[in-house]
Amino acid sequence: MEPLLSLKSVSKSYDDLNILDDIDIDIESGYFYTLLGPSGCGKTTILKLIAGFEYPDSGEVIYQNKPIGNLPPNKRKVNTVFQDYALFPHLNVYDNIAFGLKLKKLSKTEIDQKVTEALKLVKLSGYEKRNINEMSGGQKQRVAIARAIVNEPEILLLDESLSALDLKLRTEMQYELRELQSRLGITFIFVTHDQEEALALSDFLFVLKDGKIQQFGTPTDIYDEPVNRFVADFIGESNIVEGRMVRDYVVNIYGQDFECVDMGIPENKKVEVVIRPEDISLIKAEEGLFKATVDSMLFRGVHYEICCIDNKGYEWVIQTTKKAEVGSEVGLYFDPEAIHIMVPGETEEEFDKRIESYEEVDNA
């Protein structure tokens, strides 16, 4: 399938500061994509390039096989929902949503119909005459989305548009955004630095750092199989320790061999081992893969977060529903499937090829 939108070898700098460094992105129609990364990684710049608010220094922005890098925003089938919503405070809800339609000189009947449909989609039917200043943050968010979708864009861009909401409302809006995207069937490209938000909303994620794409994939793929230490650390909690590959399916962590599911890595190759906190069980000290001492325990609502120090001085974070007494000796246990091996310096292409080889072995 041909991508709906592509960025090909795109670079962008501001005042000699390199923001995007030769990136390639393919966006297919009808999916929810998220650009995820820390502040300054280039994610909002990508959104601006797609919208037409910025132009690339080099490379091409391609829409339906046609270069649009120099096309102005009003000529692109793209609408943007900004972080601050950018609503007109002197206009009511109806006039805010109808603003773009009036510029297109549509008839009053057409405008009424489209505004009514858009308000219904965002669950604000009956709010047409409401003053913007009388609305809550969540309602303003819905008005901004309605104003964007009323123009029937092929792509909807959302620039950290949930960040101003409180936690409960943000969670509610996540469900609503996902439902809205499914109903409309158009492409959403969402920018956030919130890992949990990205995992919850997305069909596909682009993880960025320093103007480069670190990894692309589904939320499950990226969480379960991070390509490098940055991704493993940025997406959720991780225990990361240095190791050495003994042979296929066996890795050595500071002198002790552990079974794993990784293969195709040279023997004695230095690697980094990732084990997620929720994949570690606390058991009796003598029954564990190794022993550790409980250093601290915090209650996180749905689980306890327990920090343990092993006899080599490494700190392990465990998420469990069981309590443990600070200062007590415990055993740590994890299955071979819980171990994920990262090879320092391995490119995403090399990493993907290695992971695909596991699937070929499983299917053989």
Curated annotation (Swiss-Prot):
The keyword ATP-binding applies. SUPFAM superfamilies: MOP-like, P-loop containing nucleoside triphosphate hydrolases. InterPro entries: AAA+_ATPase, ABC_SmlMolc_Importer, ABC_transporter-like_ATP-bd, ABC_transporter-like_CS, Mo/tungstate-bd_C_term_dom, P-loop_NTPase, Transp-assoc_OB_typ2. It catalyses: ATP + H2O + polyamine-[polyamine-binding protein]Side 1 = ADP + phosphate + polyamineSide 2 + [polyamine-binding protein]Side 1. GO terms for cellular component: ATP-binding cassette (ABC) transporter complex. It is a peripheral membrane protein. Residues 5-235 form the ABC transporter domain. ATP binds at residues 37-44. Its EC number is 7.6.2.11. SMART domains: AAA (SM00382). It is found in: Cell membrane. It holds the Pfam family TOBE_2. It is an enzyme of class 7 (translocase). Keywords: ATP-binding, Cell membrane, Membrane, Nucleotide-binding, Translocase, Transport. GO terms for molecular function: ABC-type polyamine transporter activity; ATP binding; ATP hydrolysis activity. Belongs to the ABC transporter superfamily. Spermidine/putrescine importer (TC 3.A.1.11.1) family. PANTHER family: SPERMIDINE/PUTRESCINE IMPORT ATP-BINDING PROTEIN POTA, SPERMIDINE_PUTRESCINE IMPORT ATP-BINDING PROTEIN POTA. Part of the ABC transporter complex PotABCD involved in spermidine/putrescine import. Responsible for energy coupling to the transport system. The complex is composed of two ATP-binding proteins (PotA), two transmembrane proteins (PotB and PotC) and a solute-binding protein (PotD). This is Spermidine/putrescine import ATP-binding protein PotA. It comes from Staphylococcus aureus (strain NCTC 8325 / PS 47).
